[in-house]
């Protein structure tokens, strides 16, 4: 029985991510927010809360983007309620997803570990 509940939260997470992605793009245009996209949504088991992770094109404007979404959370939740067939739409909590920044930092560190001359020898040899 618990497995069914888990699958339901996963399905709802996917639907919220898809629908909210379109609403966020409209909010970017209408409210002058930095360009961003919804990268992931985690819904609690009781479906009362949803953590929404967003990636921002300009990392230095991430605080502004998340603050703007938090200000629009009520409006975005109402839009979700109109499109989703749920008795109760989860409360939205927006967070900046820094996984892209961390991945870029790791790539930079790895690139710096191997000098360019050594990399060419490994490829040709």
From Swiss-Prot:
Tell whether GTP-binding is among the UniProt keywords: no
- Keyword annotations of the record: Cytoplasm, Ribosome biogenesis
Q: What is its main location?
A: cytoplasm
The protein's matches in InterPro entries, at most eight in alphabetical order, are given as:
KH_dom-like_a/b, RbfA, RbfA_dom_sf, Ribosome-bd_factorA_CS
Provide the GO MF annotations for this entry: ribosomal small subunit binding
- Is-annotated flag, keyword ATP-binding? no
Task: List GO terms (cellular component aspect).
Answer: cytosol
GO biological process terms held by the UniProt record: maturation of SSU-rRNA
User: Where, subcellularly, is it found?
Assistant: Cytoplasm
Gene3D superfamilies from the UniProt entry: 3.30.300.20
> What subunit structure does UniProt give?
Monomer. Binds 30S ribosomal subunits, but not 50S ribosomal subunits or 70S ribosomes.
Free-text function comment from the UniProt entry:
One of several proteins that assist in the late maturation steps of the functional core of the 30S ribosomal subunit. Associates with free 30S ribosomal subunits (but not with 30S subunits that are part of 70S ribosomes or polysomes). Required for efficient processing of 16S rRNA. May interact with the 5'-terminal helix region of 16S rRNA.
- What HAMAP family does the record tag this protein with? RbfA
Which family does the UniProt entry place this protein in?
A: Belongs to the RbfA family.
Q: What is this protein called?
A: Ribosome-binding factor A
């Amino acid at each position: 029985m618990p497995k069914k509940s888990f699958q339901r939260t996963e399905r709802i997470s996917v639907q919220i991510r898809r629908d909210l992605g379109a609403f966020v793009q409209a909010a970017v245009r209408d409210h002058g927010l930095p360009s961003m996209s919804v990268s992931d949504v985690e819904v609690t088991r009781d479906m009362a809360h949803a953590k929404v992770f967003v990636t921002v094109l300009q990392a230095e404007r991430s605080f502004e983007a998340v603050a703007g979404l938090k200000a629009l959370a009520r409006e975005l939740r109402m839009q979700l309620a109109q499109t989703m067939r749920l008795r109760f739409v989860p409360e939205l909590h927006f967070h900046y997803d820094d996984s892209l920044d961390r991945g870029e930092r790791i790539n930079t560190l790895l690139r710096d570990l191997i000098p360019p001359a050594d990399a060419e020898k490994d490829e040709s040899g």
